[in-house]
């Protein structure tokens, strides 16, 4: 079940500071893949010539922190997020003469038509309250011969985390923001906006060995929403994670995220 999108909640609670997002990013270092998700995306989109790039929903700047130096000479990157806290964090992580930062809303972009060679909307469309408007805006600001890249998650992505939480406490939230724009929804919706779509899928497992990082991830979906769980909820969750780590050497979680390269 999906959660109703409330931009004020996202701006003033979930993403006011970078702490919760960083907790949700940290867990992915336990990937069994030889490359991180950000590296996988870079290898898929293959930026081979200079251009003007817009990233909508830059978050902490994780993608360009890794890849800005790899861009062809003459490239320009505009990193945006609807949270000023996020753009400030991104600016502290990424620097260069060819990068700029702005606060922007994917549903109401202030840029000219056909302004960018590449428009990136990675794991952000489920935050849009009006998906139709957001997708039209992404397409509008992209050049006719440019590309819009979109990533999201499958309904099955990290599902074990939520199923475990729900078993421990019925108050644990299973109405995930991501469920408003999953892979399964994107497969149906995106062809209505783009004539050509190349879909790539990154499916892998996390083998988590740090219990505190695991619990920080769990908290990041509970605390910003002021949801009250039982006093011993995190202790019991810790016991489950600890038990699996003791038995297998790690706590295993499946993740699945698609990339859509749209033209």
Regions found by a protein language model. Name each.
Residues 1-51, 62-66, 86:
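Conserved class I S-adenosyl-L-methionine
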Residues 72, 128-129, 142-143:
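Helix-to-beta-strand junctions that scaffold the AdoMet/dcAdoMet cofactor pocket
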Residues 54-108:
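Class I SAM-dependent methyltransferase SAM/SAH-binding core
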Residues 117-130:
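A short SAM/SAH-binding and catalytic strip from SAM-dependent methyltransferases
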Residues 4, 34, 60-62, 180-184, ...:
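Conserved Class I S-adenosyl-L-methionine
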Residues 132-133, 139, 145-208, 225-231:
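Conserved catalytic/acceptor-binding region of the Class I
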Residues 107-118:
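A short acidic, Gly/Pro-enriched loop at the edge of an enzyme's catalytic core
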């Amino acid at each position: 079940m999906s959660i109703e999108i409330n931009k004020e909640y996202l701006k003033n609670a979930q993403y006011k500071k970078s702490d919760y997002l960083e907790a949700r990013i940290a867990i992915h270092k336990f990937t069994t893949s030889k490359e991180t998700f950000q590296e996988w995306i870079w290898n898929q989109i293959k930026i081979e010539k200079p251009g003007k790039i817009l990233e909508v929903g830059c978050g902490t700047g994780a993608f360009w922190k890794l890849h800005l130096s790899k861009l062809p000479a003459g490239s320009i990157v505009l990193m945006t997020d609807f949270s000023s806290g996020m753009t400030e964090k991104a600016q502290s992580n990424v620097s260069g003469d060819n990068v700029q930062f702005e606060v922007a809303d994917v549903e109401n972009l202030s840029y000219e038509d056909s302004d960018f060679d590449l428009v990136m909307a990675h794991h952000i469309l489920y935050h849009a309250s009006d998906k139709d408007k957001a997708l039209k805006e992404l397409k509008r600001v992209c050049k006719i011969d440019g590309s819009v890249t979109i990533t999201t998650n499958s309904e099955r992505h990290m599902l074990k985390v939520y199923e475990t939480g729900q078993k421990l406490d019925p108050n644990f939230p299973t109405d995930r923001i991501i469920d408003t724009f999953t892979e399964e929804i994107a497969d149906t919706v995106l062809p209505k906006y783009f004539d050509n779509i190349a879909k790539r899928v990154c499916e892998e497992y996390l083998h988590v060995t740090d219990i505190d990082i695991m619990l920080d991830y769990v908290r990041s979906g509970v605390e910003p929403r002021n949801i009250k769980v039982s006093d011993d909820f995190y202790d019991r969750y810790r016991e489950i994670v600890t038990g699996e780590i003791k038995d297998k050497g790690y706590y295993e979680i499946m993740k699945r995220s698609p990339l859509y390269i749209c033209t």
